[in-house]
Amino acid sequence: MGLPKGPEGQGLPEVETREDEEQNVKLTEILELLVAAGYFRARIKGLSPFDKVVGGMTWCITTCSFDVDVDLLFQENSTIGQKIALSEKIVSVLPRMKCPHQLEPHQIQGMDFIHIFPVVQWLVKRAIETKEEMGDYIRSYSISQFQKTYSLPEDDDFIKRKDKAVKTVVGLSDAYKPRRKYRRQRGAEELPDEESRVHSTLLEYGRRYGFSRQSKTEKAEDKKTALAAGLSAAEKVDAHEEDELQAAEEQRIQSLMTKMTAMANEESRLTASSVGQIVGLCSEEIKQIVSEYAGKQSELSAEESPEKLGTSQLHQRKVISLNKQILQKSKHLEELQANHTSLKAKYSDRKKTLTELKDHGEKLDKEQAALEKLEAKADPSMLQNLRALVAMNESLKSQEQEFKAHCREEMARLQQEIETLKAERAPGEKIISGGEPQGALTSTMTHNEDLDRRYNMEKEKLYKIRLLQARRNREIAILHRKIDEVPSRAELIQYQKRFIELYRQISAVHKETKQFFTLYNTLDDKKVYLEKEISLLNSIHENFSQAMASPAARDQFLRQMEQIVEGIKQSRMKMEKKKQENKMRRDQLNDQYLELLEKQRLYFKTVKEFKEEGRKNELLLSKIKAKAS
């Protein structure tokens, strides 16, 4: 692969295809590997080597459960940019797959099959391993699903015999499990060595084994050696020693057994703690248990030995037991009736509440439906104005309430001031009534009138100020509302982004719907043709026997068949013509798409050059201004 380094193309990698024999050999090996792995698209002769190799690599990567960001729709005659982009996406996935071989995008685009071959070989090996793993997993999953629904005869036999076998094994283990017959007495001295402790434990379970008793085989061997040697004296000594050992063992067993007690006696006793627990029970529970025990005992005695009792006694006991049962059942019936009445009352209350809620909900639904109808019929602008007026009315009501509260507070304050003034004036009145001159009374009345006049003036001034404040607040609220109605730049950007997202979603849904419509139309056409074919075959089948009955009918039948075949051929020609037209239209649209891509590239290039020229122009203008200054 050569890279030209001329004065104009220096630094620009120009890919060059190697057409030697080694490249062709590697290409053949790559295609054979892909076909062997299961990628049979590599056999198509109309595809270029780039499409075969890249398609095979993409197929291997997707088989290994890795994602490749490629277009699902195959495009023929891709541009160099599209090929390089596809190669870069494939190369970016290889490190995530831990591929040991390195590969560059220009090697794939330049069809350097010598470097591509090891990567394809590794991908094919990995794809085959993944297929085997998935096959094992699917096989085990299918077996498990089969076993959930169906079963083999061997499994049925095993399930039938399983419970019986388990019961037998459990019964045998319970029958032959070791049972403790003796227990060492509390306070007995501990055994010194481990051998004695083992022997004591075995004795507790009823097993008597000697400490130093030899086995029968050892005895037989000793006898054989003794006979062979002819040592009669040694036999006597051995027999005497064996008797002594046996006597010692019996003595030890007896000494150990004296320190043990039988388990039956131990189990029949009650400990102090169990007695305390029994005594700690409630007296009512003890009485109830005693009465139940007496009743059961009387019933058992009556059932076991009825011949020992008289007829009157048996009848009396039966009457007593029946009376007790009647009392118990009547108490239980009363409890159930009380519970039933309470539950019935609760049920009626809840049912009434539920009906009320349902009626209220239906009323609200009707009102909401009526309001929605009115809103649908009304003018939107008028409705908006009404909503604004309602909001303004609510705000004015709240302001009115606040103003009334403020007026009440102001009136209370002024009344308090009047009371204080009256209290200050009261001593002066007393002086006047006591014989003071009339001038003091006149001055006091003038002062009061002056205060009333000033109070009324201040009150009117306050009222005007409050009206002005309310008008200002209303204007401020209107201005705030107008300012809030104007969206900010951030909101406009957010709206724009949201509109773009909605447009993309709508276009995606539109595209998907269009595909569904196309699929539906195709399947509908297929259904129509299949129905026609079935009806034609049925008519042929029905008329075949009649047509073969006579030569004239057979000739007419053959002519009809020829006409039908000719009609099918004409329909097929029409569909082929339509297919060719669609293909030509697709090619035209593809050419237009490529032209638009070229125009887009030229547009971006022109914009970039324009920005560069603008930057140069600004730089020159700044230099000219600097020189002029």
Curated annotation (Swiss-Prot):
Keyword Cell wall biogenesis/degradation carried by entry: no
Cysteines joined through disulfide linkages: none
Coiled-coil regions, chain positions: 231-430, 558-599
Keyword annotations: Coiled coil, Endosome, Phosphoprotein, Protein transport, Transport
GO biological process, one term: protein transport
Subcellular location: Early endosome
One GO term describing the cellular component: early endosome
Region Disordered, annotated ranges: 1-23
Phosphoserine: residues carrying this PTM: S298, S301, S305
Description of how the protein assembles with itself and partners: Component of the commander complex consisting of the CCC subcomplex and the retriever subcomplex. Component of the CCC (COMMD/CCDC22/CCDC93) subcomplex consisting of COMMD1, COMMD2, COMMD3, COMMD4, COMMD5, COMMD6, COMMD7, COMMD8, COMMD9, COMMD10, CCDC22 and CCDC93. Forms a coiled-coil heterodimer with CCDC22; this heterodimer interacts with the guanine nucleotide exchange factor DENND10; the interaction is direct. Interacts with WASHC1. Interacts directly with WASHC2C. Interacts with SNX17 and SNX31.
Similarity-based family: Belongs to the CCDC93 family.
Chain's role: Component of the commander complex that is essential for endosomal recycling of transmembrane cargos; the commander complex is composed of composed of the CCC subcomplex and the retriever subcomplex. Component of the CCC complex, which is involved in the regulation of endosomal recycling of surface proteins, including integrins, signaling receptor and channels. The CCC complex associates with SNX17, retriever and WASH complexes to prevent lysosomal degradation and promote cell surface recycling of numerous cargos such as integrins ITGA5:ITGB1.
Name assigned to this protein: Coiled-coil domain-containing protein 93
Species: Mus musculus (Mouse)
